[in-house]
Curated annotation (Swiss-Prot):
Belongs to the universal ribosomal protein uL29 family. It comes from the Bacteria. HAMAP family: Ribosomal_uL29. InterPro entries: Ribosomal_protein_uL29 (IPR050063), Ribosomal_uL29 (IPR001854), Ribosomal_uL29_CS (IPR018254), Ribosomal_uL29_sf (IPR036049). The gene is rpmC. GO terms for biological process: translation. The keyword Ribonucleoprotein applies. Keywords: Ribonucleoprotein, Ribosomal protein. CDD domains: Ribosomal_L29_HIP. The keyword Cell membrane does not apply. This is Large ribosomal subunit protein uL29. One of its GO terms (cellular component) is cytosolic large ribosomal subunit.
Length: 65
């Protein structure tokens, strides 16, 4: 997920994305602990996506003040 794509989305959609990504991360961690996850790099990718979305949210909130 590119930061440019994230940065143009509205705040409500970004908050929904964070919730969805956190749920996906939970699922991936659970699959990893049970040995069902073959592509463990997805955990890192989802964590980075969460960080990108949270950064965009922070920037939007800072700009609105």
């Amino acid at each position: 997920m590119k930061f440019k794509d994230i940065n143009v989305k509205p705040v409500a959609e970004l908050e929904q994305m964070v919730n969805d990504l956190k749920a996906e991360l939970f699922t991936l961690r659970f699959q990893n602990s049970t040995g069902q996850l073959d592509q463990t790099h997805k955990i890192k990718m989802v964590r980075q996506d969460i960080a990108k979305v949270l950064t965009a949210l922070s920037q939007k909130n800072r700009g609105a003040q």
